[in-house]
Amino acid sequence: MSNYGVKELTWENGQLTVHGLGDEVEPTTSNNPIWTQSLNGCETLESVVHQAALQQPSKFQLQSPNGPNHNYESKDGSCSRKRGYPQEMDRWFAVQEESHRVGHSVTASASGTNMSWASFESGRSLKTARTGDRDYFRSGSETQDTEGDEQETRGEAGRSNGRRGRAAAIHNESERRRRDRINQRMRTLQKLLPTASKADKVSILDDVIEHLKQLQAQVQFMSLRANLPQQMMIPQLPPPQSVLSIQHQQQQQQQQQQQQQQQQQFQMSLLATMARMGMGGGGNGYGGLVPPPPPPPMMVPPMGNRDCTNGSSATLSDPYSAFFAQTMNMDLYNKMAAAIYRQQSDQTTKVNIGMPSSSSNHEKRD
């Protein structure tokens, strides 16, 4: 802080003088003017403030991006802009008003360099903004972004055009192949029907189309039928009485046919036995020596399935069916078996009786 309680700045003989109340110390101003050169008419506020700032013995130089600038000139190189203070009083009031401010900031327009400080006693700080370069870089980045967006837009447009072109080419190729197939079929039809007119060909095509529609409908019906469950397609309803009666008749017919076949087999076996025994014509006398075959066991016809619906069994045509179609029961079978056994026993006894007499005759001859 300053040693003066109150201070003021005055402009005297081209120099800035400080006046104050209280204990005085050596003035910080020198008797010699700070600027050896004349102001050359540059009596602006910036010039006055520069004089106040340069009262310290140490001097500093401001550096700009383009090089050192010792004269603290503006961008134009001279103090060409004048504030227009022709009178000394106006300058004094301006300096006094500026001195009462706590912080002073001076912007040097040369090369975009800023200089700011809080008070006369505080240290100076330099800060280079380079607003021009920043604006340049900003504008350059914006330009690059814009160019990149334009390039992306052009690339997307080119890709979309390429896709459209490929799709159109594929469509044209498929259409060409379809026309070729149609033409080939028409040529084949022309070869098959060389004298047919266009109306005949159209009618043939109409018939083919109708046939294809019918086939398609049948295929759809079959697919639907296959997808439906079996119970929904054919509901299990109880069979009517007529169906039951027909099934019963068919089962009875099957049983009768089986019985007839069994009787025929039994009669054939009896005839074969009688033929071996010599009863069916002139047989040898030793036929009774051969034991008769055992009678076939009684065959019980299997019961037919009542649930079966297919009762139409094809019967074999037998020429002896009229002869053997006779009723036979167990009583007749037993009687025939007893008669055959009696005949066999009689023949065996006769043979046994005749054999000793023949042996005695041989002895007598001897």
Swiss-Prot record:
It comes from the Eukaryota. Disruption phenotype: Plants are hypersensitive to red light, exhibiting shorter hypocotyls and larger cotyledons. Changing G14A: Loss of binding to phyB. Residues 172-181 have a biased composition (Basic and acidic residues). It is found in: Nucleus. SMART domains: HLH. GO terms for biological process: de-etiolation; red, far-red light phototransduction; regulation of DNA-templated transcription; response to light stimulus. One of its GO terms (cellular component) is nuclear speck. Mainly expressed in leaves and seedlings, and, to a lower extent, in stems, fruits, flowers and roots. Residues 59-71, 344-360 have a biased composition (Polar residues). Induction: By red light. Stable upon light exposure. Homodimer. Interacts specifically with the Pfr form of phytochrome B. Associates to PTAC12/HMR/PAP5 which acts as a transcriptional coactivator. Transcription factor acting negatively in the phytochrome B signaling pathway under prolonged red light. Regulates PHYB abundance at the post-transcriptional level, possibly via the ubiquitin-proteasome pathway. May regulate the expression of a subset of genes by binding to the G-box motif. The active phytochrome binding (APB) motif (3-17) is involved in interaction with PHYB. This is Transcription factor PIF7. It comes from Arabidopsis thaliana (Mouse-ear cress). The gene is BHLH72.
